[in-house]
C-alpha cells in the first residue's frame, strides 16, 4: 500500500503481540515505514477522525457478532467524514464446492462468528455501522471459500 501511495502514513493495530512482531518484521523487510500499536478493534487506540482509510484483511470473520458490530463502529469513529473502509473477508460461498470448503473456516472460527459471512451479510453489517455507498468490488474463489472485497464511505457530517 505504501509503495503505491508514497507519502501515505501507515498505522497497524492488533491485539496479538506475535502478529504485531510479524507485521513489524514484514514492514522492515519491505523497507516500509509504519507504526504498529497493540489494541483491540472494538476500542481502537486512536482519536476520532484520525484516518482517511481503514483497511482490513481476513479479520472480521474471527469476531463474535457483537464484537464485529463494535469493530465496524470503531472503524467509522476513527475515520474522517468522507473517509473509506476497505474490507477483504469471507462472503457467501458462490457454489456448493465453495460452501463445503468454507466449512473448514467455520469449524475453526466458529459457526456464530462466521454466520453473517456465510449468509452474505457483511455488507449489511458495514451499512448498519453507519457507512454509505457500501458495495462489493470483487469476489474470488479460493481454497477456503469465497473472498469478498468491499468498501464503504463514512458520510460527511451534517451541517448545522
Model-derived segments and their meaning:
Residues 1-43:
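Class I SAM-dependent methyltransferase SAM/SAH-binding core
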Residues 3, 69, 86-129, 133-148:
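C-terminal alpha-helical "lid/dimerization" subdomain adjacent to the S-adenosyl-L-methionine
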Residues 11, 37, 54-55, 86:
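Conserved Rossmann-like nucleotide-binding pocket used by diverse enzymes
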Residues 42-54:
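A short acidic, Gly/Pro-enriched loop at the edge of an enzyme's catalytic core
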Residues 69-81:
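A short glycine-rich, Lys/Arg-flanked "PGG" loop and its adjoining helix->strand segment in the class I
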Residues 149-160:
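C-terminal lobe and adjacent flexible extensions of AdoMet/dcAdoMet transferase-like proteins
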Amino acid at each position: 500500500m505504501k509503495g503505491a501511495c508514497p507519502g501515505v502514513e501507515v498505522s497497524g493495530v492488533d491485539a496479538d503481540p506475535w502478529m504485531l512482531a510479524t507485521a513489524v518484521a514484514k514492514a522492515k523487510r519491505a523497507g516500509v515505514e509504519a507504526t504498529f500499536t497493540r489494541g483491540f478493534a472494538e476500542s481502537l487506540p486512536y482519536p476520532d477522525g484520525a484516518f482517511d482509510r481503514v483497511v482490513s484483511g481476513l479479520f472480521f470473520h474471527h469476531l463474535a457478532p457483537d464484537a464485529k458490530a463494535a469493530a465496524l463502529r470503531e472503524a467509522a469513529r476513527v475515520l474522517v467524514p468522507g473517509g473509506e473502509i476497505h474490507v477483504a473477508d469471507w462472503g457467501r460461498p458462490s457454489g456448493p464446492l465453495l460452501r463445503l470448503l468454507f466449512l473448514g473456516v467455520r469449524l475453526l472460527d466458529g459457526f456464530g462468528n462466521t454466520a453473517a459471512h456465510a449468509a452474505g451479510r457483511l455488507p449489511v453489517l458495514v451499512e448498519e455501522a453507519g457507512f454509505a455507498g457500501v458495495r462489493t468490488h470483487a469476489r474470488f474463489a479460493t481454497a477456503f471459500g469465497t473472498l469478498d472485497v468491499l468498501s464503504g464511505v463514512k458520510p460527511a457530517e451534517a451541517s448545522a
